[in-house]
Every structure is written in C-alpha cells, then in structure tokens.
Amino acid sequence: MSLICCRIVINNSSMNTILFIIGSLRAKSFNRQLADKAREIIGGRAQIKELDYSDLPLLNQDVEQPEPVAVARVRKAIQEADALWLFTPEYNGSYPGHLKNLLDWLSRPVKPMDYGTPTCINGKRVALSGAGGKAATAGCRAKLAELLTFMKADVLPQQLGIALPPEAWSTDVLTLTDEQLAQLKALAESVI
C-alpha cells in the first residue's frame, strides 16, 4: 500500500479585492463602524482595502494635468479593486461634499482630454450602504446610485440603510439589530 500525500496551496491572488470607501471624516463615524462589521463578516473570503482619499485636491481643471499624485494613487486603487463598497452618511438629503469630489475625479478620463476612453470606475461593481438619521440614508443612496450609474459603474441593486436609534448619537456606538446584521451579511455575500 502506498501513501500519496499532496499539499494544497491557496493562492490569495485569486481572491477578490473589495475597496471600502468611507464617506464620513468623523473619528467615531457610524459608517466606519459599519465597514468594520462588514470586514468581520467577510473575514478571509476576500481581500479588504480601505481607500484613503483625505489628501485629494478639489477637482479643478487647472490642476488636472499633470495628474496630481493623490489622484494617481486613488485611481490605481480603484482600478485594482474587483468591487467598491461605499459606507456613507447622508448630508442634507444627499452625499458628503468630499465624497462627491472623489467621484468627480473618478469620472474624469485617465488619458488627458480623451473622453472616448473608459474612466477607472467604468464597469466597476459598487455596493451602497449607509448609517444615519431616520431616513436611513435613502436620499444619499438614491443620488449615489443615479450618479454612479451615469458614470457607468455597475451599481448593485441591493443596498443597506441603517436608521440610527436616538441614543446612538450620544454614545457614538453603532449597534445593529439581528435584522440589520442579516441584511449586512446578505449584502456582503453579493459583493464577494
């Protein structure tokens, strides 16, 4: 009788890369907490990266070329990701200004003034979620879906909106109900 031994090698390069984009700058952001919970749910089934776009300049065609270093870094991160997952609050029924600035940069052609070529977000799968007031970021997510679709991103139909209970605003702690956690798990499965 002979014994055959084999070794299984897991190649992490075949694992999907999901780029988290946090739409809040707040240190104790509920949306960062939501992203952290999503990261826990996904575990080792995908590679998670978080986009740092805090140094992105305001979009201005006067500084668009040569491409600013921060813009090149952000575009590269977007291009390398298999999917994007936005976690964002709602400001005045819409998305935060710094998130809009990021999306404006992503809508610009990578090749200067060549509007016939795809942008770095064309065809990119995008999931939308947010934690906020009683509207559960519905206005923000609807406007983001419209904008991202216009930008030719592939926006997932399933979204997640969390209406924070009043006490969360004084504790700065995001607590999910069983139903909300199940919805987050379902969205994570569709992103992976």
Where in this protein do the model-derived segments appear?
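Cysteine-centered motifs
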Residues: C5-C6
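Glycine-rich phosphate/pyrophosphate-binding loop and the adjoining helix
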Residues: M15, L19, F150, D154-I192
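N-terminal beta1-alpha1 ligand-phosphate binding loop
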Residues: N16-R45
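A generic structural motif
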Residues: G43-K49, A153
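N-terminal beta-loop-helix "entrance" segment that forms/cooperates
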Residues: Y53-V69, A168-V173
